[in-house]
């Protein structure tokens, strides 16, 4: 009799997972398979689409990398130091989660535009942020910013100070302690945060459509290209591009996870 509650619980979880995630993906590919394969291939390999794929992956990778570096620094400061306004800063980290992405894009465009507070300063040196790839990168960094911090924070908080003190007592310098004691403990969480940040940036739409020019071969990303295809009633094109992005995301995440597994087995 004890098996039945477990079976019911597992069945509910499987059904939830299937209807929420698996079924929509299966339906997407079934709709694509109903069309002529030459047309599907033409849509998938269109030069504009290929350019959008490459730019999306490139900018998402850069955004995750930037967030990993600065996210680690911010997490270290929040967990290791006490200062006035620390609680406010800690709460503000989650702001991108709550803020609608279109509002985020509008805010970034206002601040970093040619007439904005920061954008006008860069404009004096002939450097434009909005309506360029830099704007796309900035939007991706903003929306994926909290993931690295929230992944690293619990690990740093639970790390025992005695490990560092033991390393210092054995004559290790601060850098050696960080490299040989602290960093190996943080690597799994850092990789997880990088992966989550990359995944979030890869699918961003709302803020990018507000801050970029959305022109092909310039700063057009895959999510905006899908929206443009839907506006033109090109449902096949939107479905194919969406499927390609899905496969790219899946392949990239599997690659990152495989690298993570191999690294921590050694």
UniProtKB/Swiss-Prot annotation:
Regions crossing the membrane: 12-32, 59-79, 91-111, 129-149, 181-201, 206-226, 236-256
Provide the protein's localization. Answer: Plastid, Chloroplast membrane
Task: Report the PROSITE patterns cross-referenced here.
Answer: ABC_TM1
Q: Which residues form the ABC transmembrane type-1 domain?
A: 53-257
For this protein, what is any one GO molecular function term? Answer: ABC-type sulfate transporter activity
One Pfam annotation reads: BPD_transp_1
Q: Which organism is it from?
A: Chlorella vulgaris
Q: Please explain the role this protein plays, according to its UniProt record.
A: Part of the ABC transporter complex cysAWTP (TC 3.A.1.6.1) involved in sulfate/thiosulfate import. Probably responsible for the translocation of the substrate across the membrane.
* Protein name in UniProt: Probable sulfate transport system permease protein cysT
Swiss-Prot/TrEMBL keywords: Chloroplast, Membrane, Plastid, Sulfate transport, Transmembrane, Transmembrane helix, Transport
Q: Which family does it belong to?
A: Belongs to the binding-protein-dependent transport system permease family. CysTW subfamily.
Question: InterPro entries attached here?
Answer: CysT_permease, MetI-like, MetI-like_sf, Sulph_transpt2
What does the entry list under GO cellular component?
A: chloroplast membrane; plasma membrane
Q: How does it sit in the membrane?
A: Multi-pass membrane protein
